[in-house]
Amino acid sequence: MVDIATQLAAVDRGIQTMDVDGVPSYVQTLTQTYPSPIDEVWEALTSAGRIERWFLPISGDLKLGGHYQFVGNAGGEVLACTPPTGGQASFRLSWAMDPTAPTYVTVRLTGDGDHTRLVLEHVAGVEMLPPGMWEQFGPSGTGIGWDSGLLGLALHLTAPDERPDDPAAWTMTDEGKAFMRGSADAWAAAQVADGTDAAVAKTGADRTYGMYIGEVDGPWSE
């Protein structure tokens, strides 16, 4: 059994609507501290053999300037990469379902002995998202996916035997649905903190949850 309540509570979520390099953007952040040293977390995040054990199979050249592709998901380029030194590490990627509309992901690690703080920042230019996506789904449209990734990483690092054998099938169990519902609600709260009306945020969270359980078409549906 996955302790979904503990995992949901372990993540701090933020959303800001702001200009990034002069481009109107949505900036999502997720922060979690793992009970693992920075070298171990870095290896789990940057080794193809490790990544597929907690996220998705990946192909490509995982080094600065290299290109990568997750099976059935996003791909992009490694734009910056600083391995652990002095208790700090980071990397930056372009991240896109559609190569003509890239978004950007930065991951920063801060080590403190046997613990590591991870901050994931996802920057999406307003014009890079499918038309109407943000208005319909809000930050949970991508946020549930990021929450699922951090859950996978947490289980990989701390309780690998508890990771579902088939994560995709797990999302359709009562436990998996409860996790996605909790994630959607948490992102709605973060959106309200950014100034969005609570009713609008809740509607987006409800629609996103419906998308993830197959009751609502997603933004990339034909």
What are these regions, as identified by a protein language model?
Residues 9-16, 55-58, 73-77, 102-106:
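Short small/polar-residue motifs
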Residues 35-37, 112:
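Structural motif
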